[in-house]
Each structure stands twice: as C-alpha cells, then as structure tokens.
C-alpha cells in the first residue's frame, strides 16, 4: 500500500467500491425479499429482526454524541436522534418501523420485546454499537457511510414488496420515505468530516475498514435470517417461529 493520501475523489471511489462488493442489497435473502420469493412468515422474520437494528441506532448515535468535542458537531449529529426517535411518542423512524412490523402481521408488543430475534441479529447489532462506542470518532462516523448506498436498496425494496406481497401497502412502508432525504444529509456530513479529519493514508484506510465492518454487520444479519428461515431453515431455540403458510 502506498503512503500517498487519497484525494477526496479517490476516497469516494474506494468507498463506492466497497458498497458495490459488500452492501447487503446483494445478499440472497434481500434478493428473495425484493423479488417476492418469500412467504409472509419469512417477511415477518425479517421485519422482527430488523427492528432490533432500528431500535439500537438511536443508542448508537447517543453514544457517539456524548463523545463529540464541539457544539457544532453535536448539533449536527443530534438530528439523527430526532430522525429515529422523533420529538414525540409515535414519531420517528423506530415508530415507523413498528408500524411496518404490525403491517406485515406481527404483534407490536412482541416486536418491542425483542424476545424472538435471532442470536446472530443480537450479536451483530451489539457489535456495531460497541464499535461506535469504542473506536475513534473518525471510524465511528465512517461506519455510518452505508447510507451512501441506501437509496438504491430503498427503491428496490419498496417497488419489489409492493409488487409482490398483497399484505404490504404504501402505508406499511412509510418508514422508507423520510430516509430518502435523511440519509443523503447524513452522508454529506460524514464525508465532510472525513475529508477534514482523515489527513493521512493510514487514517483513510481506517475509514475504509470501518465501512467494511459496517457492511459485515448488515450482511451477517441476513446470513442469520437466511440460515434460520430459508436454507437450511434451522430456527434457534426461543426465536420467532412463523405460522405455517
């Protein structure tokens, strides 16, 4: 590896290359979800397990917020908490995800309890929260850059699920509409911070490694779902069991 610092354009190209290879829109479970190949119970398993990820994002963001050294940075990052937790009960991304889970036929209290999630889901999400808590601020912010690729997966997911699943409506998928504007805003902040603070090639490599780690977090959640609910279909003890189709 050369010690030469990458230009902003070169760094973005390297980040995009990671997404093109590793982002979870490429996972077989997501391909099946978007192509209408899953039964309702499998869609429920996805919504249930994804809730744990959604519910821990505000905790992850609050952990980083406490570490940011300036008021300007804290104000910018605080908007993520508002996006996910909302400013009142029933608002924000977590509440909208609960609405999605109810829309595909799950009981709200059961989803909120997280009692039925897969161990692999819990381990992956908790590892992400710990990463943001324990690694450098630069790496923590860089790990959020999977949002660079989220508009593509949102478009695929919304169009595919509406086309293939009669139990899914536009209202069910309301979570995704605000993300189309929130995610680019968050990406702009993260890239600006990285351009200013990743001043050496070694720091830039840390940025790239953080994005790879986050892609692994997302991919491993889908590995767990695929193993439990698709092939070979071995659901761990205590995890959600769909009703027979």
Spell out what each predicted region is.
Residues 2-245:
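Non-heme di-metal
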């Amino acid at each position: 590896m050369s010690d030469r610092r990458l230009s902003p354009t070169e760094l973005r190209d390297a980040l995009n290359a990671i997404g093109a290879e590793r982002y979870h829109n490429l996972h077989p479970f997501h391909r099946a979800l978007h192509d209408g190949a899953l039964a309702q119970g499998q869609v429920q398993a996805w919504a249930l397990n994804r809730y744990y990820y959604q519910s821990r994002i505000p905790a992850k963001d609050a952990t980083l917020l406490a570490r940011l050294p300036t008021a300007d940075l804290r104000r910018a990052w605080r908007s993520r908490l508002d996006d996910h937790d909302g400013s009142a009960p029933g608002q924000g991304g977590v509440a909208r995800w609960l609405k999605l889970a109810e829309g595909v036929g799950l009981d709200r209290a059961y989803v909120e309890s997280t009692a039925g999630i897969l161990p692999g889901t819990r381990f992956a999400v908790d590892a992400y929260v710990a990463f943001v808590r324990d690694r450098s601020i630069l790496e923590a912010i860089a790990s959020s850059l999977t949002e660079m690729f989220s508009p593509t997966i949102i478009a695929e997911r919304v169009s595919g699920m509406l086309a293939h699943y009669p139990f899914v409506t536009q209202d069910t998928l309301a979570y995704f509409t605000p993300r189309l504007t929130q995610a680019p805003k968050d990406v702009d902040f993260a890239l600006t911070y990285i351009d200013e603070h990743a001043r050496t090639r070694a720091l830039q490599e840390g940025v790239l490694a953080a994005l790879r780690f986050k892609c692994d977090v997302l991919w491993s959640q889908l590995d767990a779902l695929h193993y439990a609910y698709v092939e070979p279909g071995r659901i761990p003890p205590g995890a959600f069991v769909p009703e027979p189709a």
